[in-house]
Amino acid sequence: LLLLLALKTLWAVGNRFEAQIIGGREAVPHSRPYMVSLQNTKSHMCGGVLVHQKWVLTAAHCLSEPLQQLKLVFGLHSLHDPQDPGLTFYIKQAIKHPGYNLKYENDLALLKLDGRVKPSKNVKPLALPRKPRDKPAEGSRCSTAGWGITHQRGQLAKSLQELDLRLLDTRMCNNSRFWNGVLTDSMLCLKAGAKGQAPCKGDSGGPLVCGKGKVDGILSFSSKNCTDIFKPTVATAVAPYSSWIRKVIGRWSPQPLT
């Protein structure tokens, strides 16, 4: 009975598909100054989060095109507002987690900018978890944001959308009725507050924030049907990788994290 009740509350974005926000709300402009739009020569592809003046954290699977064709745009609210074009940087170096694979395990990548971001009201880094054990607990209230599609098979959002989420028990999400054992301990399983709400195509790589002041997860994958209740959206927990992230940043940018 408990499982059936849980089924009614689940949502998702059965095959894995890059996480993409349906049923969200427009964010207050520039209320999430850490948000990044990863774009190719044509349009927005994925989200990301500024974690250092020279580094962005995103999902490794988002790097499906040559780096020369990609750019990072900061300080955006609307994707196509000529009056507010944002701040653009190109990628000098991309470092995927060495354990990343096509099962979306360890789905993280660090992108080094070709310059340094000057913190401002609209562009500001989000802190990393301090310890590897600082994963948010089951039941935690979280939120995410992105410019992903707002309807199944629809178009990208015109402005930044946000969505409230709650963390589910990963063991339940690994049940044969759900993800059937594919989730690892470093993955976070998520549900929205209402049926028909979910991150969707274009939201991969965006940050999951639980509480205040730090990035707790990076949106990773879901099903092709964004709101499939049997396939909750999955994020990569950042805390277990905090040492790796700091090591990479420290190696290539020998200065204190900001």
UniProtKB/Swiss-Prot annotation:
InterPro entries, per database record: Peptidase_S1_PA, Peptidase_S1_PA_chymotrypsin, Peptidase_S1A, Trypsin_dom, TRYPSIN_HIS, TRYPSIN_SER
GO MF annotation terms: endopeptidase activity; serine-type endopeptidase activity; serine-type peptidase activity
GO biological process: apoptotic process; innate immune response; killing of cells of another organism; protein maturation; proteolysis; T cell mediated cytotoxicity
Disulphide-bridged cysteine pairs: 46-62, 142-210, 173-189, 200-226
Glycosylation (residues): 174, 225
A GO cellular component entry from the record: extracellular space
Broad class of the protein's primary localization: secreted
The Peptidase S1 domain, residue ranges: 21-250
Residues of the active site: 61 (charge relay system), 107 (charge relay system), 204 (charge relay system)
Family annotation (CDD domains): Tryp_SPc
SUPFAM superfamilies, alphabetized: Trypsin-like serine proteases
Enzyme Commission no: 3.4.21.-
Domain of life: Eukaryota
Keywords, alphabetical: Apoptosis, Cytolysis, Disulfide bond, Glycoprotein, Hydrolase, Immunity, Innate immunity, Protease, Secreted, Serine protease, Signal, Zymogen
Protein function: Cleaves peptide substrates after methionine, leucine, and norleucine. Physiological substrates include EZR, alpha-tubulins and the apoptosis inhibitor BIRC5/Survivin. Promotes caspase activation and subsequent apoptosis of target cells.
Family from the record: Belongs to the peptidase S1 family. Granzyme subfamily.
Name this polypeptide is given: Granzyme M
